[in-house]
Amino acid sequence: MKTTTRLLDLTAAMVLVVYVSFSPPLVSGEPGRRVSMTLVRDAAALGAFCLDGSLPAYHLDRGFGAGSNNWILQFEGGGWCNDIASCVERAKTRRGSTRYMSKTVVFTGVLSNNASQNPDFYNWNKVRLRYCDGASFAGDSQFGNGTSLLYFRGQRIWNAIILDLLPKGLAKAHKALLTGCSAGGLSTFLHCDNFTSYLPKNASVKCMSDAGFFLDAIDVAANRTMRSFYSQLVSLQGIQKNLDPSCTHAFFPEPSLCFFPQYVLRFIKTPFFILNSAYDVFQFHHGLVPPSADQTGRWNRCKLNVTACNPHQLDALQGFRKDMLGALMNFFRNSTRGGMFINSCFDHCQSALEETWLSPTSPRINNKTIAETVGDWYFGRGEEAKEIGCPYPCDKTCHNLIPASTSDFLASNASGSGHNSRGTHLTFLFLLLNFFFFFVISKFSKKDYVT
């Protein structure tokens, strides 16, 4: 299928979210627990395959003590593929095949079994669902042309993993939390109510999305890049039939809009928590300012260092935050069982690592960490757990992935561990990858490509 350069840019850029979302933890102190992979052997009978036809997988760390009947499931993130060429390439990597995945993963942050780092969930059964379908566990189709064979079976993978976990104790869960980061965070919006339907009626079941509230944004060139991308994704991978029917009916004749969390949110019945940065780095770089919307490179310096942004660019960033809060306002005002933590950091995924989830230097709003806010919401401690941070540059507790202040820039060039060790380690890679993408776009942005 023929796509615009705009979609090619976004597809290529997904490698950023792969690293940012689920890289090895960059934290000082004790390492997290390493957990082995479990292949879903019965998945083949359900037609549940990764893109390349390999079996899906998950990692299970058993709960103990008072948490032995409680479960937390985390969708892995890692972008999407919306056309045949990008899915063919993805199938040759760990994002499209369990053959290339690490057989063990480290559990940190909300999956940590350390009581001091994860006091509310440390002793629960913890599961990471490996991501290998390229469509947030939502597709149900396949493609074959005699040369390539691709399985778009994310929905079946989701079902197969749940069916594998039910006899292992999930069917008797007392408490459960479905969560995920990035593309996995988007998965929680798509599967939250379905998750609830599998569990006992008297179980306390809730869902939390981390960095998964992808906006239907208008970019700086007045295009809807993400809408175009998701529309092709929904069509290619046969997602429409798995979207919430109440939502697709409400948004007919554009059912693919229901892949956006802002549109499906009001149809979700299960209590929901939204963790997101109002200046999410992935959305800043590929929703608000995708390379195709800035072919002359006017935004290059700003995208790599927020202190280099001019007043017009800062206004656009503040406008993006305003749009995100606007999309969340009905939920903020009217959801009696919902929770939220919307800070003003240049970050992407904050529940997966100790230093942003719960540590002495974790991000805070009203002096509450993310872990404290989520715990208060889940267990009903105190008043409503809905926190919205003040706009950039007022938040001094951030772990920014790109420099957003003079202190961030100095930290990224300083030796040793500091307040922003995650940003320190990731800044160089982030800059390198972005310069690579800018180079590619400068070479090819004047043409359309079959991707």
UniProtKB/Swiss-Prot annotation:
GO biological process: cell wall organization
Top EC category: hydrolase
Claim: DNA-binding is one of the keywords in the record: no
GO MF terms held by the record: pectin acetylesterase activity
Subcellular location field: Secreted, Cell wall
A GO CC term attached to the entry: extracellular region
Ranges that cross the membrane: none
Keywords annotated in UniProt: Cell wall, Cell wall biogenesis/degradation, Glycoprotein, Hydrolase, Secreted, Signal
Predominant localisation class: secreted
Glycosylated sites: N114, N145, N194, N202, N223, N305, N334, N367, N413
Disrupted-gene phenotype: Reduced inflorescence stem growth and increased levels of acetate in rosette leaves.
Residue runs in coiled coils: none
Superkingdom as given in the UniProt entry: Eukaryota
InterPro entries: PAE/NOTUM
Enzyme Commission number(s) from the entry: 3.1.1.-
Record's signal peptide: 1-29
Catalytic center residues: S182, D280, H348
Function: Hydrolyzes acetyl esters in homogalacturonan regions of pectin. In type I primary cell wall, galacturonic acid residues of pectin can be acetylated at the O-2 and O-3 positions. Decreasing the degree of acetylation of pectin gels in vitro alters their physical properties.
UniProt record similarity statement: Belongs to the pectinacetylesterase family.
Protein name, as recorded: Pectin acetylesterase 9
Native source organism of the sequence: Arabidopsis thaliana
Gene: PAE9
